[in-house]
Amino acid sequence: MPEGPEIRRAADNLEAAIKGKPLTDVWFAFPQLKTYQSQLIGQHVTHVETRGKALLTHFSNDLTLYSHNQLYGVWRVVDTGEEPQTTRVLRVKLQTADKTILLYSASDIEMLRPEQLTTHPFLQRVGPDVLDPNLTPEVVKERLLSPRFRNRQFAGLLLDQAFLAGLGNYLRVEILWQVGLTGNHKAKDLNAAQLDALAHALLDIPRFSYATRGLVDENKHHGALFRFKVFHRDGEPCERCGSIIEKTTLSSRPFYWCPGCQH
Protein backbone atom coordinates (compact mmCIF):
# COMPACT_ATOMS: atom_id res chain seq x y z
CA MET A 1 0.00 0.00 0.00
CA PRO A 2 1.36 3.48 -0.78
CA GLU A 3 2.49 5.41 2.28
CA GLY A 4 2.29 9.09 3.11
CA PRO A 5 5.08 10.30 0.77
CA GLU A 6 3.58 8.48 -2.22
CA ILE A 7 0.07 9.78 -1.48
CA ARG A 8 1.36 13.35 -1.16
CA ARG A 9 3.21 13.07 -4.48
CA ALA A 10 0.01 11.82 -6.09
CA ALA A 11 -1.79 14.86 -4.69
CA ASP A 12 0.93 17.12 -6.10
CA ASN A 13 0.46 15.56 -9.54
CA LEU A 14 -3.31 16.03 -9.42
CA GLU A 15 -2.96 19.67 -8.39
CA ALA A 16 -0.44 20.35 -11.14
CA ALA A 17 -2.84 18.91 -13.71
CA ILE A 18 -6.17 20.57 -12.89
CA LYS A 19 -5.95 22.99 -9.95
CA GLY A 20 -7.78 26.25 -10.69
CA LYS A 21 -9.13 25.08 -14.07
CA PRO A 22 -12.90 24.91 -14.71
CA LEU A 23 -14.25 21.37 -14.80
CA THR A 24 -15.80 20.58 -18.17
CA ASP A 25 -16.98 17.07 -17.33
CA VAL A 26 -17.42 15.11 -14.11
CA TRP A 27 -18.34 11.44 -13.76
CA PHE A 28 -18.77 9.17 -10.75
CA ALA A 29 -19.33 5.42 -10.89
CA PHE A 30 -21.22 5.15 -7.60
CA PRO A 31 -24.95 6.00 -7.79
CA GLN A 32 -24.90 7.98 -4.52
CA LEU A 33 -22.41 10.41 -6.09
CA LYS A 34 -24.21 10.94 -9.40
CA THR A 35 -26.17 13.96 -8.14
CA TYR A 36 -22.90 15.83 -7.60
CA GLN A 37 -21.83 15.60 -11.24
CA SER A 38 -23.85 18.60 -12.41
CA GLN A 39 -22.97 20.57 -9.26
CA LEU A 40 -19.27 20.37 -10.10
CA ILE A 41 -19.42 21.33 -13.78
CA GLY A 42 -17.86 24.78 -14.09
CA GLN A 43 -16.33 24.60 -10.62
CA HIS A 44 -12.59 24.07 -10.07
CA VAL A 45 -10.29 22.22 -7.70
CA THR A 46 -8.88 24.67 -5.14
CA HIS A 47 -6.37 22.27 -3.58
CA VAL A 48 -5.74 18.61 -2.86
CA GLU A 49 -5.06 17.72 0.76
CA THR A 50 -3.70 14.52 2.27
CA ARG A 51 -4.61 13.06 5.63
CA GLY A 52 -2.24 10.14 5.92
CA LYS A 53 -3.32 7.74 3.19
CA ALA A 54 -6.61 9.54 2.47
CA LEU A 55 -6.90 12.24 -0.16
CA LEU A 56 -9.24 15.24 0.00
CA THR A 57 -9.98 17.04 -3.27
CA HIS A 58 -11.48 20.43 -2.42
CA PHE A 59 -13.74 22.24 -4.91
CA SER A 60 -14.60 25.93 -5.28
CA ASN A 61 -18.23 25.34 -4.20
CA ASP A 62 -17.04 24.00 -0.81
CA LEU A 63 -17.64 20.35 -1.62
CA THR A 64 -14.80 17.91 -0.90
CA LEU A 65 -14.21 14.54 -2.53
CA TYR A 66 -12.86 12.06 0.03
CA SER A 67 -11.02 9.05 -1.35
CA HIS A 68 -8.88 6.34 0.22
CA ASN A 69 -6.91 4.22 -2.21
CA GLN A 70 -6.59 1.28 0.19
CA LEU A 71 -4.72 -1.55 -1.58
CA TYR A 72 -5.81 -1.13 -5.17
CA GLY A 73 -6.89 2.43 -5.86
CA VAL A 74 -4.76 4.57 -8.15
CA TRP A 75 -5.05 8.08 -9.60
CA ARG A 76 -3.89 8.82 -13.14
CA VAL A 77 -3.42 12.07 -15.05
CA VAL A 78 -4.09 12.02 -18.81
CA ASP A 79 -4.57 14.47 -21.63
CA THR A 80 -8.27 15.20 -22.04
CA GLY A 81 -9.72 12.82 -24.62
CA GLU A 82 -7.18 10.10 -23.90
CA GLU A 83 -8.55 6.77 -22.69
CA PRO A 84 -5.87 4.67 -20.96
CA GLN A 85 -5.72 0.98 -21.80
CA THR A 86 -6.28 -0.68 -18.45
CA THR A 87 -8.22 -3.49 -16.85
CA ARG A 88 -8.86 -1.35 -13.78
CA VAL A 89 -12.40 -0.15 -13.03
CA LEU A 90 -12.92 3.60 -13.38
CA ARG A 91 -14.51 5.23 -10.31
CA VAL A 92 -14.03 8.99 -10.79
CA LYS A 93 -13.34 11.32 -13.72
CA LEU A 94 -12.63 15.04 -13.28
CA GLN A 95 -12.04 16.68 -16.65
CA THR A 96 -10.76 20.11 -17.67
CA ALA A 97 -10.11 21.51 -21.13
CA ASP A 98 -6.60 20.06 -21.33
CA LYS A 99 -6.11 17.55 -18.51
CA THR A 100 -8.24 14.87 -16.87
CA ILE A 101 -7.65 13.03 -13.61
CA LEU A 102 -9.00 9.51 -13.21
CA LEU A 103 -9.41 7.38 -10.10
CA TYR A 104 -9.41 3.63 -10.65
CA SER A 105 -10.33 0.67 -8.44
CA ALA A 106 -10.86 2.55 -5.16
CA SER A 107 -14.03 1.72 -3.24
CA ASP A 108 -13.88 4.20 -0.34
CA ILE A 109 -15.13 7.39 -2.01
CA GLU A 110 -17.50 10.02 -0.59
CA MET A 111 -18.54 13.62 -1.18
CA LEU A 112 -18.38 15.73 1.95
CA ARG A 113 -19.78 19.12 2.88
CA PRO A 114 -17.68 21.45 5.09
CA GLU A 115 -19.36 20.39 8.33
CA GLN A 116 -18.73 16.72 7.55
CA LEU A 117 -14.95 17.19 7.42
CA THR A 118 -14.87 17.25 11.21
CA THR A 119 -17.28 14.36 11.72
CA HIS A 120 -16.14 11.83 9.11
CA PRO A 121 -15.14 8.61 10.94
CA PHE A 122 -11.72 8.21 9.31
CA LEU A 123 -10.83 11.89 9.49
CA GLN A 124 -11.85 11.98 13.17
CA ARG A 125 -9.74 8.94 13.96
CA VAL A 126 -6.58 9.76 12.03
CA GLY A 127 -3.68 11.38 13.87
CA PRO A 128 -1.47 14.30 12.77
CA ASP A 129 0.06 13.87 9.32
CA VAL A 130 3.84 13.34 9.33
CA LEU A 131 4.12 15.55 6.24
CA ASP A 132 2.31 18.47 7.87
CA PRO A 133 5.04 21.14 8.16
CA ASN A 134 3.40 22.44 11.32
CA LEU A 135 3.89 19.13 13.14
CA THR A 136 6.97 19.34 15.38
CA PRO A 137 9.13 16.73 17.15
CA GLU A 138 7.91 18.16 20.45
CA VAL A 139 4.30 17.32 19.57
CA VAL A 140 5.35 13.85 18.41
CA LYS A 141 7.17 13.33 21.71
CA GLU A 142 4.03 14.32 23.60
CA ARG A 143 2.02 11.77 21.62
CA LEU A 144 4.61 9.06 22.24
CA LEU A 145 4.40 9.64 26.00
CA SER A 146 0.62 10.08 26.15
CA PRO A 147 -1.37 7.47 28.12
CA ARG A 148 -2.95 6.31 24.88
CA PHE A 149 0.32 5.37 23.16
CA ARG A 150 3.17 5.07 25.70
CA ASN A 151 2.56 1.37 26.43
CA ARG A 152 2.23 0.30 22.79
CA GLN A 153 4.99 -1.69 21.07
CA PHE A 154 6.41 0.21 18.12
CA ALA A 155 5.74 -2.71 15.77
CA GLY A 156 2.04 -1.93 15.92
CA LEU A 157 2.11 1.72 16.95
CA LEU A 158 3.99 2.88 13.86
CA LEU A 159 1.33 1.31 11.64
CA ASP A 160 -1.56 2.88 13.55
CA GLN A 161 -2.87 5.89 11.63
CA ALA A 162 -4.44 7.20 14.84
CA PHE A 163 -0.92 7.75 16.21
CA LEU A 164 0.64 9.46 13.19
CA ALA A 165 -0.96 9.50 9.77
CA GLY A 166 1.08 8.58 6.71
CA LEU A 167 3.39 5.99 8.21
CA GLY A 168 3.45 2.48 6.78
CA ASN A 169 5.64 -0.58 6.66
CA TYR A 170 8.72 0.66 4.82
CA LEU A 171 8.77 3.83 6.93
CA ARG A 172 8.29 1.78 10.11
CA VAL A 173 11.35 -0.39 9.53
CA GLU A 174 13.55 2.45 8.26
CA ILE A 175 12.70 4.70 11.22
CA LEU A 176 13.40 2.00 13.79
CA TRP A 177 16.70 1.11 12.11
CA GLN A 178 17.72 4.76 12.06
CA VAL A 179 17.31 5.07 15.83
CA GLY A 180 18.58 1.57 16.69
CA LEU A 181 15.36 0.31 18.25
CA THR A 182 13.31 -2.84 17.70
CA GLY A 183 9.62 -3.32 17.12
CA ASN A 184 9.22 -4.58 20.67
CA HIS A 185 10.29 -1.34 22.31
CA LYS A 186 7.75 1.00 23.92
CA ALA A 187 7.97 4.75 24.40
CA LYS A 188 7.71 4.44 28.19
CA ASP A 189 10.98 2.47 28.26
CA LEU A 190 13.11 4.96 26.30
CA ASN A 191 15.60 7.38 27.79
CA ALA A 192 15.51 11.06 26.89
CA ALA A 193 18.05 10.76 24.07
CA GLN A 194 16.26 7.79 22.49
CA LEU A 195 12.91 9.52 22.73
CA ASP A 196 14.27 12.67 21.11
CA ALA A 197 15.93 10.71 18.29
CA LEU A 198 12.74 8.76 17.60
CA ALA A 199 10.55 11.88 17.58
CA HIS A 200 12.82 13.49 15.00
CA ALA A 201 13.12 10.34 12.86
CA LEU A 202 9.34 9.92 12.75
CA LEU A 203 9.19 13.22 10.86
CA ASP A 204 12.56 13.44 9.13
CA ILE A 205 12.47 10.12 7.29
CA PRO A 206 8.95 10.46 5.77
CA ARG A 207 9.74 14.05 4.77
CA PHE A 208 13.06 13.02 3.25
CA SER A 209 11.30 10.27 1.30
CA TYR A 210 8.75 12.77 0.00
CA ALA A 211 11.19 15.57 -0.75
CA THR A 212 13.63 13.42 -2.69
CA ARG A 213 10.83 12.15 -4.91
CA GLY A 214 11.39 8.40 -5.15
CA LEU A 215 9.32 5.33 -5.85
CA VAL A 216 8.51 2.78 -3.19
CA ASP A 217 9.17 -0.18 -5.50
CA GLU A 218 12.69 0.98 -6.27
CA ASN A 219 15.50 0.62 -3.76
CA LYS A 220 15.96 4.36 -3.63
CA HIS A 221 13.93 7.53 -3.51
CA HIS A 222 14.32 10.43 -5.91
CA GLY A 223 17.67 9.70 -7.48
CA ALA A 224 20.02 8.22 -4.91
CA LEU A 225 19.17 10.50 -2.01
CA PHE A 226 16.93 8.16 -0.04
CA ARG A 227 17.97 4.52 0.13
CA PHE A 228 16.40 1.66 1.99
CA LYS A 229 18.80 0.66 4.75
CA VAL A 230 16.91 -2.48 5.80
CA PHE A 231 13.61 -2.72 3.90
CA HIS A 232 13.75 -5.71 1.49
CA ARG A 233 17.44 -6.15 2.34
CA ASP A 234 17.30 -9.34 4.43
CA GLY A 235 20.44 -11.43 3.99
CA GLU A 236 22.59 -8.39 3.25
CA PRO A 237 25.12 -6.82 5.63
CA CYS A 238 23.99 -3.82 7.66
CA GLU A 239 25.84 -0.73 6.46
CA ARG A 240 26.13 0.52 10.04
CA CYS A 241 27.53 -2.52 11.85
CA GLY A 242 28.06 -5.27 9.26
CA SER A 243 25.65 -7.77 10.83
CA ILE A 244 23.25 -9.58 8.53
CA ILE A 245 19.83 -8.00 8.18
CA GLU A 246 17.00 -10.34 9.14
CA LYS A 247 13.34 -10.59 8.24
CA THR A 248 10.48 -11.59 10.48
CA THR A 249 6.78 -10.76 10.86
CA LEU A 250 5.51 -8.18 13.34
CA SER A 251 1.91 -6.97 13.52
CA SER A 252 1.13 -9.23 10.54
CA ARG A 253 3.54 -7.34 8.27
CA PRO A 254 7.08 -8.18 7.08
CA PHE A 255 9.63 -6.60 9.39
CA TYR A 256 13.28 -6.06 8.51
CA TRP A 257 15.90 -5.32 11.15
CA CYS A 258 19.54 -5.63 12.13
CA PRO A 259 20.16 -7.76 15.24
CA GLY A 260 23.61 -6.23 15.59
CA CYS A 261 22.61 -2.61 16.14
CA GLN A 262 18.88 -2.65 16.90
CA HIS A 263 18.40 -3.73 20.48
Swiss-Prot record:
HAMAP family: Endonuclease_8. This is Endonuclease 8. It comes from Shigella sonnei (strain Ss046). GO terms for biological process: base-excision repair. It comes from the Bacteria. The gene is nei. Belongs to the FPG family. The active site is at P2, E3, K53, R253. Its EC number is 3.2.2.-, 4.2.99.18. DNA binds at Q70, R125, N169. One of its GO terms (molecular function) is damaged DNA binding. Pfam families: Fapy_DNA_glyco, H2TH, zf-FPG_IleRS. SMART domains: Fapy_DNA_glyco, H2TH. The keyword Repeat does not apply. InterPro entries: DNA_glyclase/AP_lyase_DNA-bd (IPR015886), DNA_glyclase_Znf_dom_DNA_BS (IPR015887), EcNei-like_N (IPR044091), Endonuclease-VIII (IPR023713), FPG_cat (IPR012319), MutM-like_N-ter (IPR035937), Ribosomal_uS13-like_H2TH (IPR010979), Znf_DNA_glyclase/AP_lyase (IPR000214). It catalyses: 2'-deoxyribonucleotide-(2'-deoxyribose 5'-phosphate)-2'-deoxyribonucleotide-DNA = a 3'-end 2'-deoxyribonucleotide-(2,3-dehydro-2,3-deoxyribose 5'-phosphate)-DNA + a 5'-end 5'-phospho-2'-deoxyribonucleoside-DNA + H(+). Coiled coil: none annotated. Keywords: DNA damage, DNA repair, DNA-binding, Glycosidase, Hydrolase, Lyase, Metal-binding, Multifunctional enzyme, Zinc, Zinc-finger. Involved in base excision repair of DNA damaged by oxidation or by mutagenic agents. Acts as a DNA glycosylase that recognizes and removes damaged bases. Has a preference for oxidized pyrimidines, such as thymine glycol, 5,6-dihydrouracil and 5,6-dihydrothymine. Has AP (apurinic/apyrimidinic) lyase activity and introduces nicks in the DNA strand. Cleaves the DNA backbone by beta-delta elimination to generate a single-strand break at the site of the removed base with both 3'- and 5'-phosphates. The keyword DNA repair applies. Binds 1 zinc ion per subunit. A zinc finger (FPG-type) spans 229-263. Its cofactor is Zn(2+).
